[in-house]
Every structure is written in C-alpha cells, then in structure tokens.
Curated annotation (Swiss-Prot):
Keywords: Ribonucleoprotein, Ribosomal protein, RNA-binding, rRNA-binding. InterPro entries: Ribosomal_uL14, Ribosomal_uL14_bac-type, Ribosomal_uL14_CS, Ribosomal_uL14_sf. Binds to 23S rRNA. Forms part of two intersubunit bridges in the 70S ribosome. The gene is rplN. One of its GO terms (cellular component) is cytosolic large ribosomal subunit. Belongs to the universal ribosomal protein uL14 family. One of its GO terms (molecular function) is structural constituent of ribosome. GO terms for biological process: translation. The keyword Ubl conjugation does not apply. It holds the Pfam family Ribosomal_L14. Part of the 50S ribosomal subunit. Forms a cluster with proteins L3 and L19. In the 70S ribosome, L14 and L19 interact and together make contacts with the 16S rRNA in bridges B5 and B8. SUPFAM superfamilies: Ribosomal protein L14. This is Large ribosomal subunit protein uL14.
C-alpha cells in the first residue's frame, strides 16, 4: 500500500534511484496505490548525467509492494521492497531495462512492455 510521501525504489535504468509519491492517481479511492496503479512522484535521488534529474516530477507505475496482495486463486504475494517503473504520458517505460521481479498483475493493466523487459514475472 503506497500513499502520499512514501519513498520508493526505482526498478529501471532511467537514472532515478528513489522517488517520493505525492499523488495517487489510480488506486483505492485515490488514497492507496497497489501493484499496477499509477502515481505522481518527485525524484529524490538520481544518478549524474541521467535522463531524469533530482526534483523532476514523474509518473510511475508500482511494480512491487511490501504489503501483500491477494490473488484470485487465494494465494498471497509480497515483495521485499516498494518499487516503481517510471513511465511517460503514453504509459511506456522511460528506461530500457527493468531490475528485479515484477508481479503478473501488470498484465491486467496492459503494461505489456514492462512485463517483456522484466527478468522475472511472479
């Protein structure tokens, strides 16, 4: 469950390392974001000479959460960290690589490009 002022890791090579959520645009009553939801965030930590700079406002989709989510078959899945992938206005990822596993719930939200770039889909 991601809410405002949550610090998240960035799981792509766009250049940002950490971002802070300041608005949940698609989520549970626009209060909490889970896997597959879109948030607006500001870059808190970035690599030098990267595509995004510290202080930039970006859109990101949540790909991993520490809070467990229940699947339709009754199983639960949770991850070790809260992570996002930075996207553009069309919903395509800005980076060309994804680091770490992502949840298969992203397929339901039509983030097929993120699924194809990820090394592991759980």
């Amino acid at each position: 469950m991601i809410q405002e002022r949550t610090i998240l890791n960035v799981a792509d090579n766009s250049g940002a390392r950490k971002i802070r959520c300041f608005r949940v645009t698609k989520g549970l009553k626009r209060r909490y974001a889970s896997i597959g939801d879109v948030i607006h965030a500001s870059v808190q930590d970035a690599l030098p000479h990267a595509n995004v700079k510290k202080g930039d406002v970006v859109k990101a989709v949540v790909v991993r959460t520490v809070k467990e989510i229940r699947r339709a078959d009754g199983t639960y899945i949770k991850f070790d960290d809260n992570a996002t992938v930075i996207i553009n206005d069309e919903g395509e990822p800005k980076g060309t690589r994804i680091f770490g596993p992502v949840a298969k719930e992203l397929r339901e939200n039509n983030y097929l490009k993120i699924i194809s770039l990820a090394p592991e889909v759980i």
